[in-house]
């Protein structure tokens, strides 16, 4: 494993569970993939680091036997909308600030253990994985007339901690788990190799549509600063009633472990901070807890550089992957 706060040497392999589900004629198996996966999967098949293999990945998933192939980006858009509106509500009604992002499950667990006083600051929004999973077990199940108990919801993630997240108590919108099985980018690569698919020669195919197309804001979730930038864009649009096409948030982009900035939103100075890597998070949160640092929004990612450097990605030095994928 590339990144793990507890020092795990390897992930728990769930590929056989997925294969068994696909081979069960009574189950409808639906898969979603995070944006960081398409930027790294090609490395397992000899392609240059950072090659976008979205189309071939979708084709491979269909040939593995998945009934529907969805893009987690749509769930990310929903997370953005909810998080931006939650921030607006807290500002207008004197809610708990700073609002701290909650889509990195390793970070959330770290907060619960070491900074319990800040758990009320965490956004109440589900992560993109869980948003998409909830849609699959509710909207998709209702549309297709399928009992949610007969749907196996699978996610492909760059993150090993997603295996933990799917089993949290509050992740069951339809009364059944939003996501049943989570596998990593490396596990998907193993499945493709076991099926003897010639990945490089696969055609380019599109995701199945969810409720419409997703946005670029959803795609940047995979890089440190991306969640905060997406939420700021949305909050500014909602508060000012204008679609801002050309606002630049350069100060919170890039691979540095700690970034901060102040942006003018609807006449208000919004102070924000972005941290990736738990060492950096630990230092910042101590300052927030003591009152030494004061922000409106804080983004925390467990892995240095964000999800592109997740523990389930192909093995590469994190500095190499950060430079390639985020750019």
Residue ranges, per PLM feature:
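Cysteine-centered iron-sulfur cluster-binding motifs in ferredoxin-type domains/subunits
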Residues: 1-7, 302
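Iron-sulfur-associated redox domains of electron-transfer enzymes in respiratory
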Residues: 10-327
């Amino acid at each position: 494993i590339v990144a793990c706060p507890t020092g795990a040497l390897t992930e728990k392999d769930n590929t056989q569970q997925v294969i068994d589900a696909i081979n069960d004629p009574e189950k409808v198996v639906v898969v979603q993939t995070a944006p960081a996966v398409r930027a790294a999967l090609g490395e397992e098949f000899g392609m240059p680091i950072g090659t976008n293999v979205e189309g071939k990945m979708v084709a491979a998933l269909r040939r593995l036997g998945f009934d529907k192939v969805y893009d987690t980006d749509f769930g990310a858009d929903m997370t953005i909308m909810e998080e931006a509106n939650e921030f607006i509500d807290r500002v207008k009604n004197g809610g708990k600030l700073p609002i701290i992002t909650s889509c990195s499950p390793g970070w959330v667990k770290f907060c619960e253990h070491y900074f319990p006083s800040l758990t009320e600051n965490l956004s109440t929004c589900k992560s993109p994985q869980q948003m998409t999973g909830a849609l699959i077990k509710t909207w998709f199940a209702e549309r297709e007339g399928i009992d949610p108990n007969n749907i196996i919801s699978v996610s492909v993630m760059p993150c090993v901690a997603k295996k933990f997240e799917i089993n949290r108590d509050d992740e069951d919108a339809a009364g059944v788990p939003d996501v049943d099985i989570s596998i990593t980018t490396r596990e998907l690569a193993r499945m493709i190799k076991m099926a003897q698919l010639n990945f490089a020669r696969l055609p380019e195919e599109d995701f199945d549509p969810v409720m419409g197309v997703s946005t670029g804001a959803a795609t940047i979730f995979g890089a440190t600063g991306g969640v905060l930038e997406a939420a700021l864009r949305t909050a500014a649009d909602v508060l000012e009633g204008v679609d801002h096409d050309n606002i630049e948030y350069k100060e919170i982009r890039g691979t540095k472990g700690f970034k901060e900035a102040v942006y003018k939103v609807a006449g208000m100075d919004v102070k924000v901070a972005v941290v990736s890597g738990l060492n950096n998070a630990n230092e910042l949160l101590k300052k927030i807890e003591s009152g030494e640092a004061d922000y409106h929004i804080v983004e925390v990612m467990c892995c240095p550089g964000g999800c592109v450097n997740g523990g389930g990605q192909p093995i590469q030095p994190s500095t190499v992957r950060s430079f390639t994928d985020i750019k």
